[in-house]
Amino acid sequence: MSQLDLNALNELPKVDRVLALAETNAQLETLTAEERVAWALENLPGEYVLSSSFGIQAAVSLHLVNQIRPDIPVILTDTGYLFPEAYQFIDELTDKLKLNLKVYRAGESPAWQEARYGKLWEQGVEGIEKYNEINKVEPMNRALKELNAQTWFAGLRREQSGSRAHLPVLAIQRGVFKVLPIIDWDNRTVYQYLQKHGLKYHPLWDQGYLSVGDTHTTRKWEPGMAEEETRFFGLKRECGLHEG
């Protein structure tokens, strides 16, 4: 697999970019997660960053990528509405894995947003999308720009939702290469990796949460629910970071 030209690919229409990366993706599908990270570091341009929501299985990608690329900037977009257990988990993993954590937030505080717009998450899909744009998308765009990122690693998996079921290992999003090393892992592989390396699930896992975001848009799993139905009242799965 030869080195890819990000500028040239960005000039192509989205469909043509997908086609241009098809052969590379076919080869990446045959590699292990660790090999995919190593390939990206050798063949894709820096600077390199890793994003994490510090969700249920976040320790996997944080450990895997950081072991191969120590001190890689880890981007967290903090809404200010995470569970207390989530903030404790962030502190724990940052210390345990010696993460180079970079926290980005909206320009307006949560209280100021509520004063201006009300509780956006209670205002249907449009309100949720505006909330995500303010608290997730804009801070992430700012992070990628300030960190001069050209290659972005993330821990998405196809098994997590229908919206992720057909994602490739390598794509271009927000003008940078996006690499998903564990995209084809199932829950069993995740569990085995955590056990092998002495890592833990998010503390809310034991309380019945399959996916964790903000306190006001996250529900415990109940029988008959798909994982994606536990977020955003089942109206949508993605927070905006991994769309577009």
From Swiss-Prot:
Q: Which UniProt keywords apply?
A: Cytoplasm, Oxidoreductase
The superkingdom listed in its UniProt entry is Bacteria
Q: Which residues form a coiled coil?
A: none
A GO term from the CC aspect: cytoplasm
Which spans are transmembrane here? Answer: none
Annotated pathway, please? Sulfur metabolism; hydrogen sulfide biosynthesis; sulfite from sulfate: step 3/3
Q: Kindly state which reaction or reactions the protein catalyses.
A: [thioredoxin]-disulfide + sulfite + adenosine 3',5'-bisphosphate + 2 H(+) = [thioredoxin]-dithiol + 3'-phosphoadenylyl sulfate
Q: Which GO terms describe its biological process?
A: hydrogen sulfide biosynthetic process; sulfate assimilation, phosphoadenylyl sulfate reduction by phosphoadenylyl-sulfate reductase (thioredoxin)
Q: What is its EC number?
A: 1.8.4.8
Q: Which InterPro entries match?
A: PAPS/APS_Rdtase, PAPS_reduct_dom, PAPS_reductase_CysH, Rossmann-like_a/b/a_fold
Catalytic residues, chain numbering: 239 (nucleophile)
Q: Name one Pfam family in it.
A: PAPS_reduct
Q: Where in the cell is it found?
A: Cytoplasm
Q: Which NCBIfam families match?
A: cysH, PAPS_reductase, PRK02090.1
Quote the function comment for this protein. Catalyzes the formation of sulfite from phosphoadenosine 5'-phosphosulfate (PAPS) using thioredoxin as an electron donor.
Name the family the entry cites.
Belongs to the PAPS reductase family. CysH subfamily.
- What name does UniProt use for this protein? Phosphoadenosine 5'-phosphosulfate reductase
